[in-house]
């Protein structure tokens, strides 16, 4: 008998003629997530992916695999030759183990799947036979098919599988199946969630961060690095580009109306991000903006910001409430880092009354007072790049 992780995927099943491409990408991503653990056997069969895990830390493996985009759920199962008497023994062992872990278990349910049609019993018959065996051999337990304390699963294919746990994954599509995008990563709550959401749709990401050093601190930059490392646990290793926006902000502060500081700064960020994206084969920009959340995120403000670039701008949080964004940031474990009290470039020269309904003509008029190309070129010349990985 061997231990194996059974990995299930969902949306990939709907991909028709492209299904194999997505499956192969998912296998590749799972292998990559486990690559430093040794030569684990990861393989595809019966529209599932399997990882042989004997002699390995199973908890570590499941924790890594559940973060791989495309994985809907996984289970740690016992695998052995198909034999009904042996299946009965393993089912008893499984339910007894669960009862030792949780003495409060009083009800159970059997769920059986007969993938191998050569097996003489149908799925419902298998469940009845095994359920009866449990009732005959374990005291103080009963069947509850609607709200059981524990469900025991049996799958019969070329071999038999028995398990009682289902660990949820995040679903989505495997990384590397939908191009590459550049994430504008701040130190806040929203942008890491936006990057995660785009990654979940199979988009590889790189990231760019704007700071205002020395008006913003080294610790603020370290915070962004920490967020990027958490994100790399889901999205894989990526490049983080850092740009000092302070010289541009000083020029805006000196030559443009105070209330336009935020919107003009955002336009410069987008222009610089687009240059970096195009130089690195990115197909889109990604931001954490949500309608109406702050002054620069009204519909008119977003329209003025968009007009600064030609690349598509993905805003996966656009209609989400803040509480929903916070919930997701907690789920992906970026929240506690995001709320650390370190300033970012948006706090520098913050206007008392930022324009919320900007007119593009007026913003372009103010922008014409600046040497836009020279400011962008200087920022790009001072660009810093770091490779971000969860292992760092």
Curated annotation (Swiss-Prot):
UniProt binding sites for ATP: 184-185, 209-210, 266, 288, 297
Predominant localisation class: cytoplasm
Involved pathway(s): Cofactor biosynthesis; thiamine diphosphate biosynthesis
GO biological process terms held by the UniProt record: thiamine biosynthetic process; thiamine diphosphate biosynthetic process; thiazole biosynthetic process; tRNA 4-thiouridine biosynthesis
Keyword tRNA-binding: yes
Gene Ontology MF, one: CCA tRNA nucleotidyltransferase activity
Catalysed reactions, semicolon-separated: [ThiI sulfur-carrier protein]-S-sulfanyl-L-cysteine + a uridine in tRNA + 2 reduced [2Fe-2S]-[ferredoxin] + ATP + H(+) = [ThiI sulfur-carrier protein]-L-cysteine + a 4-thiouridine in tRNA + 2 oxidized [2Fe-2S]-[ferredoxin] + AMP + diphosphate; [ThiS sulfur-carrier protein]-C-terminal Gly-Gly-AMP + S-sulfanyl-L-cysteinyl-[cysteine desulfurase] + AH2 = [ThiS sulfur-carrier protein]-C-terminal-Gly-aminoethanethioate + L-cysteinyl-[cysteine desulfurase] + A + AMP + 2 H(+)
Listed EC numbers: 2.8.1.4
Subcellular location: Cytoplasm
Alphabetical keyword list: ATP-binding, Cytoplasm, Nucleotide-binding, RNA-binding, Thiamine biosynthesis, Transferase, tRNA-binding
Domain (THUMP): residue spans on this chain: 59-167
Gene3D superfamilies in alphabetical order: 3.30.2130.30, HUPs
Protein's job: Catalyzes the ATP-dependent transfer of a sulfur to tRNA to produce 4-thiouridine in position 8 of tRNAs, which functions as a near-UV photosensor. Also catalyzes the transfer of sulfur to the sulfur carrier protein ThiS, forming ThiS-thiocarboxylate. This is a step in the synthesis of thiazole, in the thiamine biosynthesis pathway. The sulfur is donated as persulfide by IscS.
Protein family (similarity comment): Belongs to the ThiI family.
Protein name according to UniProt: Probable tRNA sulfurtransferase
């Amino acid at each position: 008998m061997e231990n194996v992780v059974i990995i299930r995927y969902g949306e990939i099943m709907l991909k028709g003629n492209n299904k194999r491409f997505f499956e192969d990408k998912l296998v590749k991503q799972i292998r990559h997530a486990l690559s430093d653990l040794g030569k684990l056997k990861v393989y595809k069969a019966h529209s599932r992916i399997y990882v042989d895990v004997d002699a390995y830390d199973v908890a570590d493996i499941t924790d890594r695999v559940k973060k791989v985009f495309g994985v809907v759920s996984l289970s740690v199962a016992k695998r052995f030759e198909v034999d009904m008497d042996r299946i009965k023994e393993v089912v008893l062992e499984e339910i007894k183990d669960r009862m030792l872990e949780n003495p409060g278990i009083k009800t159970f349910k059997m769920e059986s799947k007969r993938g191998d049609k050569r097996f003489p019993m149908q799925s419902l018959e298998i469940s009845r036979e095994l359920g009866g065996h449990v009732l005959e051999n374990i005291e103080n337990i009963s069947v509850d098919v609607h709200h059981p304390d524990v469900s025991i699963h049996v799958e019969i294919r070329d071999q038999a599988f028995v398990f009682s746990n289902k660990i949820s994954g995040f679903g989505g599509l495997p990384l590397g199946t939908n191009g590459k995008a550049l994430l504008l990563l701040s130190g806040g709550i929203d942008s890491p969630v936006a990057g995660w959401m785009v990654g979940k749709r199979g988009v590889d990401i790189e990231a760019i961060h704007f700071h205002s050093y020395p008006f913003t601190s080294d610790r603020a930059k370290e915070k962004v690095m920490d967020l990027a490392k958490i994100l790399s646990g889901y999205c894989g290793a990526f490049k983080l580009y850092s740009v000092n926006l302070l010289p541009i902000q000083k020029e805006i502060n000196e030559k443009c109306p105070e209330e336009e500081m935020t919107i003009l700064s955002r336009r410069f960020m987008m222009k610089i991000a687009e240059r970096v994206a195009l130089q690195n084969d990115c197909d889109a920009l990604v931001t954490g903006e949500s309608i109406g959340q702050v002054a620069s995120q009204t519909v008119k403000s977003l329209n003025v910001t968009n007009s600064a670039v030609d690349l598509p701008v993905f805003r996966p949080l656009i209609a989400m409430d803040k509480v929903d964004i916070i919930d997701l940031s907690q789920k992906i474990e970026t929240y506690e880092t995001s709320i650390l009290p370190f300033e970012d470039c948006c706090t520098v020269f913050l206007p008392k009354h930022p324009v919320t309904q900007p007119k593009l003509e007026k913003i372009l008029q103010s922008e014409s007072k600046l040497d836009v190309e020279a400011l962008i070129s200087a920022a790009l010349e001072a660009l810093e790049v770091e490779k971000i990985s969860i292992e760092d």
